[in-house]
Amino acid sequence: MQKIVINVEWCGLNYSGGYGSPDLGVCVATGDTWEEFKQEFAEAMDFHLEGMEEHGDPLPQWAVDRDYEIEYKMATSALLHRALKYTTLEAISRASGLRRSALKSYATGDVCPRDAQSEKILQALKKISADLQELADSMK
């Protein structure tokens, strides 16, 4: 099974991402929500492959067989935007030690954080998740 890695960003009002390779060209999609983006990308990829087949373009066997899985690699902007469905910038700020204003700039995509800041955000989200799981487990 072939793994297709999709780089996902938050751009203005949408998640957006794409895949490109010398064998397949480029396929892109956008979506208002995370779920919509994933569905739109899967449909766009299938449509792209169908079009290549109809035009007689050569395809790798995995593409002909549709034997692939999609892995999404989220940029910090997309990660933060998706996380805001479950938490707040204030909570992420407390857990990460980063200023709320910086997080807001990262979430909108206006500023691209350095790797160290992205790692702090990821660790903060993992901590928030673990804390919420511990809280839920205490209700059993």
PLM region spans:
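DNA-binding alpha-helical recognition surfaces that contact promoter or target DNA
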Residues: 39, 105, 123
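Hydrophobic micro-packing sites on short alpha-helices
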Residues: 117-122
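Short, charged, surface-exposed hinge/linker loops at domain edges
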Residues: 1-3, 43-101, 105-107, 111-116, ...
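DNA-contacting interfaces and partner/effector-binding or oligomerization modules
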Residues: 1-57, 61
